[in-house]
Every structure is written in structure tokens, then in C-alpha cells.
């Protein structure tokens, strides 16, 4: 996303505190639905920026009050357990590089007061991305807070 695109998104900002929600999922849409509902509620009192790294969900509307940013999407191949870009013209490194640039640009332009992670710390496939996001936010705003939105159910292989 270009700086001019981001500036257009910020045209309606007020003086409310700013929150970035980092949402990543590789199967299903549960994390996305949770993040959108959380963002929708929080947008009544905050400027909320939802940063989505999973596949776009076309039939689940994000409220207009939430600033939505779709990163290049990744999914996990169930057979190989490998992350794969949804856009097959990208290799994994290029996809992560593009995501990193988008995250850095958003953090620089918003200087968030709060980061909410969805699917982290349990989503260890994205540990480097989220840890870099946290470090970048803290370097821009040392007073920012970090919150983990935990909803994962860890199951054993036998379903117990």
C-alpha cells in the first residue's frame, strides 16, 4: 500500500487513541471473525486498524469505522505444514518482505497506543513477524501496550 493510500485512510481520524489489531490465521476464519468483532466494538472509543494476514473473507463485512489493511495472505499446507503465499506469483520471502514493509509503514503513520495480537503467541509460524511488530511499535511509542487476544484450543492428536 502506498503512503498516499494510507493518508486517504487517515483522513477521518480524530484524537481517539490508536489500536492496531494484528490478525493471522491459516485455517478457517475463527480468528478473523473474532478480530473483526473486537475491532468493531473498540472502534466506538478508539481508532482501530485491523491488519489481516490471512486469506480475504469476502462475505464477512468489516465495519466502515475500522481501518482495514489486507497484507499479502499466507496459508498453511495441511500435508507439508509449510506456509504458502495465496498469491502464487510470490515466493515466501517476498511475501514476508511485503508484509514487513506494510506493517512498518502502518506503525510509522499511526504510532499506536495499543497492539492486540490475534493468534499469537500460539501462532509461532509468525513469531518473527509479530516480535518485529512489537519492537517497531515500542520504538515508535515506548508507552504503547501489548495485549494478546487468546482463543486457541489446543487439542491432542486423539481429540482429547
Task: List the model feature ranges, each with a label.
Residues 85-128:
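Conserved nucleotide-sugar donor-binding subdomain of glycosyltransferases
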Residues 6-28, 116-119:
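Nucleotide-activated donor-dependent transferases that construct or modify glycoconjugates
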Residues 15-17, 25, 41, 45, ...:
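Conserved nucleotide-sugar phosphate-binding/catalytic loop shared by glycosyltransferases and other
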Residues 25-29, 120-126, 153-154:
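Gly/Ser/Thr-rich loops at beta-strand to alpha-helix junctions
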Amino acid at each position: 500500500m502506498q503512503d498516499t493510500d494510507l493518508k486517504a485512510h487517515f483522513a477521518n481520524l480524530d484524537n481517539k487513541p490508536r489500536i492496531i489489531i494484528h490478525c493471522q490465521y491459516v485455517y478457517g476464519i475463527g480468528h478473523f471473525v473474532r478480530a473483526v468483532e473486537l475491532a468493531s466494538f473498540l472502534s466506538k472509543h478508539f481508532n482501530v486498524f485491523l491488519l489481516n494476514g490471512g486469506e480475504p473473507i469476502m462475505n464477512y463485512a468489516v465495519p466502515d469505522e475500522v481501518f482495514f489493511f489486507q497484507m499479502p495472505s499466507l496459508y498453511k499446507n495441511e500435508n507439508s505444514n509449510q506456509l504458502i503465499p495465496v498469491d502464487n506469483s510470490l515466493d515466501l520471502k517476498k511475501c514476508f518482505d511485503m508484509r514487513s514493509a506494510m506493517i512498518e509503514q502502518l506503525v510509522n503513520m499511526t504510532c499506536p497506543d495499543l497492539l492486540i495480537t490475534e493468534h499469537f503467541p500460539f501462532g509461532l509460524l509468525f513469531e518473527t513477524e509479530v516480535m518485529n511488530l512489537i519492537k517497531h511499535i515500542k520504538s515508535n511509542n515506548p508507552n504503547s501496550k501489548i495485549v494478546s487476544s487468546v482463543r486457541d484450543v489446543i487439542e491432542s492428536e486423539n481429540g482429547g
